[in-house]
Amino acid sequence: MSILVIGGAGFIGRRLVPILAADGHAVTCMDIDVAGAAAAFASLADKVTIVRGDVTQFDDVIGAVQESGAERLINLSYFIGDLPPHVAFKLDIQGMDNCFEAARRCGVKHAVFASSLAVSGPQDYFGERLVDESDERRGESQYAVNKITNEWQAHDYRRAYGMVITCIRPANVTGPDKKFGSIDHVNCMCQPARGQSVTFPHADTRRCVIHVDD
């Protein structure tokens, strides 16, 4: 199967691409960081095709879909944290729309994108009970609200065109090489292992973590 992974050189993509290649899929990684992708997948040169592309540019996205002959598209391209609003909109919202529209025009059979547990908002809204996908989305940060918007975009494309789009809401993805976004949970595990102290910004900080390899 031909799979296009957009943002494949990122924290999650670096793990996902080799798994897909090992399963026998024809994988294309589109990323703005071609050098990083080449380094990450150096041992998979005969199994992974790397193309430079900017998710905010529709021509880059649809070009990658067409060139790869993608049957499946996975979008992992995102900024973790806050950006100036105009920049955040282009990357997080317009970028996602570019992926969905390119998938629609090219007849991609299945699109997958990473949303986030952040869409639910703080646990305080729900008390001590478990939160699931049927609960109200109460995220308030730029990151969370943009993810909520992405979920609405996916719903709109499914409604309008009957597309198959899967949204995944990971928890706080953790791993020793995570450098951006919420890294307090990374520091909590890694710094003591290195003999270093760890500091949390708030005494009542709570995280729901999942290892990146999972």
Predicted regions and their residues:
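N-terminal Rossmann NAD(P)H-binding glycine-rich loop of SDR-like oxidoreductase domains
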Residues: 4-23
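Rossmann-fold cofactor-recognition segment
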Residues: 44-57
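Glycine-rich NAD(P)-binding loop of the Rossmann-fold in SDR/ketoreductase-type enzymes
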Residues: 56, 72, 87-98, 137, ...
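Conserved Rossmann-fold NAD(P)-dependent oxidoreductase catalytic core, especially the SDR/UDP-sugar
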Residues: 75, 98-142
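NAD(P)-dependent short-chain dehydrogenase/reductase
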Residues: 155-207, 212-213
